Amino acid sequence: MDVLPMCSIFQELQIVHETGYFSALPSLEEYWQQTCLELERYLQSEPCYVSASEIKFDSQEDLWTKIILAREKKEESELKISSSPPEDTLISPSFCYNLETNSLNSDVSSESSDSSEELSPTAKFTSDPIGEVLVSSGKLSSSVTSTPPSSPELSREPSQLWGCVPGELPSPGKVRSGTSGKPGDKGNGDASPDGRRRVHRCHFNGCRKVYTKSSHLKAHQRTHTGEKPYRCSWEGCEWRFARSDELTRHFRKHTGAKPFKCSHCDRCFSRSDHLALHMKRHL
């Protein structure tokens, strides 16, 4: 909330003209502004708790049925277009060459990437009926796959599995492939402004937020569950918080620490947003 000061610059000049100085001590009005900011923060409504039983996912059988039906429908349409399609045309040489090239590029990029980020493909193939089914069916649940959500195997596109030669298991290089080497390519997921892919998605009903780090996703999910693991260690204080930075700001109330100092005057503040509000007085 942006609270505009009632005292204008002309009144301040009048005080300086009459007394010869302007007191830097906080006035009653400034105390009122700080109190309004604190009340607005701590009187917010608590997030409602959502039990795990209320989260509904598609069953594994239904998902695989949709995948198989989509694949059969795609094959039937290909048979209608070409009267006698040879089996070798299902895997074109250019497609295999792209897979090999993508695997080499992904091996180089994965070694220099951060270990906390997931490996996810950024290239999207033109004909991918399985991907359309996955998009229409919603989110993948933990019952669909045995790997955890942070596993790189979840970020593998289904078209890479169907593109392999029958009877041949996909190699680790092909599983990790997907980056075409072009900086302008975009994948299925949302891309953040700094170029990193946001691959950590919230699976609660009605929430579509995506994050680049798993720690940020865990902090966001606490707003759904109501979990507050960070407790104030001050004697006699029972406050609990969902994020560590909220606990740090709260602890400054006990210690009286004010690390944020104004560069124009000697005023100090315990929070950065309070300093930003104060800096508007110097503009």
UniProtKB/Swiss-Prot annotation:
- Transcription: is it a keyword of this entry? yes
Spell out the Basic and acidic residues composition-biased ranges: 183-196
| Protein name listed in UniProt | Krueppel-like factor 6
Motif 9aaTAD per record, residues = 62-70
Q: Which keywords does this Swiss-Prot/TrEMBL entry list? A: Activator, DNA-binding, Metal-binding, Nucleus, Repeat, Transcription, Transcription regulation, Zinc, Zinc-finger
Would you kindly state one Gene Ontology biological process term found in this protein's UniProt entry? Answer: regulation of transcription by RNA polymerase II
Q: Does the keyword NAD apply?
A: no
Q: List the Pfam families.
A: zf-C2H2 (PF00096)
Alphabetically, the GO molecular function entries are: DNA-binding transcription activator activity, RNA polymerase II-specific; DNA-binding transcription factor activity, RNA polymerase II-specific; RNA polymerase II cis-regulatory region sequence-specific DNA binding; sequence-specific double-stranded DNA binding; zinc ion binding
ZnF C2H2-type residues are 200-224, 230-254, 260-282
